[in-house]
Curated annotation (Swiss-Prot):
It comes from Bos taurus (Bovine). Belongs to the phosphatidyl serine synthase family. Pathway: Phospholipid metabolism; phosphatidylserine biosynthesis. This is Phosphatidylserine synthase 1. Keywords: Acetylation, Endoplasmic reticulum, Lipid biosynthesis, Lipid metabolism, Membrane, Phospholipid biosynthesis, Phospholipid metabolism, Phosphoprotein, Transferase, Transmembrane, Transmembrane helix.
Length: 473
């Protein structure tokens, strides 16, 4: 009797909540192609771990202290990634393999712990650590100390404009193409692009390299590099949205060419989500959520410049571009989880990768403030307040413009919940692309296909699904 009283039957809301959170935090693999890659191999990994540790512990030369420390750190990272594959969640993506995204999450946890460790060091210890990683950093200089910015802006010649198309211009272009692939909204991408140029103006008194001529900011940065990258990224998004994916199993492909093509397709998304950051029923919570998204995005970008300015290393140094690539890698699942949290009322909490990304952004800012107190003592509080107000205004203006566009030019359609197949809101409208859209966390179904949707959902329940390498029916 006591056990009956103590037990609690989960309500429908509790079940929906757990299901919705799991869809963005623990995506399951459906339509498994090669069973070997999705079977649990825990005993094999355990044996490999023990044997490899014994081999390196008793056979390598440990007479060089620096090599001992370096190889020990690499071994810790390597085996932590093995634990990540075994224990961490898949996240919202499953292509090319869930193990990859578990390792991405594991690397983000390691970086988070490394930032916590840095907070308990002094500046000399941090610099000694950097010199140990790369002795050439002893002779590094700040770009702002050897270059001039925003000089002779009234002189505009073709030679001067062409000279600005360097490797960094191509970096801007491809960087914004990738950002457009992640955000998938013209309005939000353009808002972030313009807001970043305003951010440079407000923080120009701290970072001299933010000073640019007006034609460099408006024409080269916003219109050509950023705008071209946004256009390319959105074209790719539109192509993926209109494309129908038929993920055939290797067992169903009998030609060598077909098997090779299927292997290449394994490194493309299983499906693509049509993203709607804004809808005509947006509330204050939606505005606040997108405002927070833009603030964290701008903060992450600012950290890139403050870190290399405070700790003195060039933008071309591996410490800079490796961090940029790493942040880009963890941004993909982060944006996906935050979008689901922001747009689906059934998702009551953010995913773990999104949580870790937010902590990393603020920890990097704290590290910059601690070790750059001389720099931040020159901060003009008025500029920071105006920057926050400017971001808030542009967020509201962009949201209002997107809502106005949706109300006047959007097509009224039934829409399904971001994480749930069977629920929709018929009174929300926004512009929709052609064809049926899918997502990494489950295909979006068209309202007219309710019968086929139900049958497909029943069929999916009978297929094998994998979570953290453990297969279950």
């Amino acid at each position: 009797m006591a056990s009956c009283v103590g037990s609690r039957t989960l309500s429908k809301d509790d079940v929906n909540y757990k299901m919705h959170f799991r869809m963005i935090n623990e995506q399951q693999v459906e339509d498994i192609t090669i069973d070997f890659f999705y079977r649990p191999h825990t005993i094999t990994l355990l044996s490999f771990t023990i044997v490899s540790l014994m081999y390196f512990a008793f056979t390598r030369d440990d007479s060089v202290p620096e090599d001992n420390i370096w190889r020990g750190i690499l071994s810790v990272i390597f085996f932590f990634l093995i634990i990540s594959v075994l224990a961490f969640p898949n996240g919202p993506f499953t292509r090319p393999h869930p193990a990859l995204w578990r390792m991405v999450f594991g690397l983000s946890v390691l970086y988070f712990l490394f930032l916590v460790f840095l907070l308990f060091l002094n500046f000399e210890q941090v610099k000694s650590l950097m010199y140990w990683l790369d002795p050439n950093l002893r002779y590094a200089t700040r770009e702002a100390d050897v270059m001039e910015y925003a000089v002779n802006c009234h002189v505009i010649t073709w030679e001067r404009i062409i000279s600005h198309f360097d490797i960094f211009a191509f970096g801007h272009f491809w960087g914004w193409a990738m950002k457009a692939l992640l955000i998938r909204s013209y309005g939000l991408c353009w808002t972030i692009s313009i807001t970043w140029e305003l951010t440079e103006l407000f923080f120009m008194h701290l970072l001299p390299n933010f000073a640019e001529c007006w034609w460099d900011q408006v024409i080269l940065d916003i219109l050509l590099c950023n705008g071209g990258g946004i256009w390319l990224g959105m074209v790719v998004c539109r192509f993926l949205e209109m494309r129908t994916y038929h993920w055939a199993s290797f067992k169903d492909i009998h030609t060598t060419t077909g098997k090779i093509k299927r292997a290449v397709l394994q490194f493309t998304p299983a499906s693509w989500t049509y993203v709607r950051w804004f809808d005509p029923k947006s509330s204050f919570q939606r505005v606040a959520g997108i405002y927070l998204f833009m603030i964290i995005w701008q903060l992450t970008e600012l950290n890139t410049f403050f870190l290399k300015h405070i700790f003195v290393f060039q933008a071309s140094h591996p410490l800079s571009w490796c961090r940029i690539l790493f942040i880009g890698g963890i941004t993909a699942p982060t944006v996906r989880q935050y979008y689901a949290y922001l747009t689906d009322t059934q998702c009551k909490r953010v995913g773990t990768q999104c949580w870790v990304f937010g902590v990393i952004g603020f920890l990097e800012a704290i590290v910059c403030i601690k070790f750059g107190q001389d720099l931040f003592s020159k901060t003009q509080i008025l500029y920071v307040v105006l920057w926050l107000l400017c971001v808030a205004f542009t967020t509201f203006l962009c949201l209002y413009g997107m809502v106005w566009y949706a109300e006047h030019y959007g097509h009224r359609e039934k829409t399904y919940s971001e994480c749930e197949d069977g629920t929709y809101s018929p009174d929300i409208s926004w512009p929709h692309g052609k064809g049926s859209k899918g997502s990494e966390d489950g295909p979006h179904k068209h309202p007219g296909n309710s019968e086929s949707h139900s049958s497909r959902r029943r069929n999916r329940h009978s297929k094998s699904k994998v979570t953290n390498g453990v297969g279950k029916k």
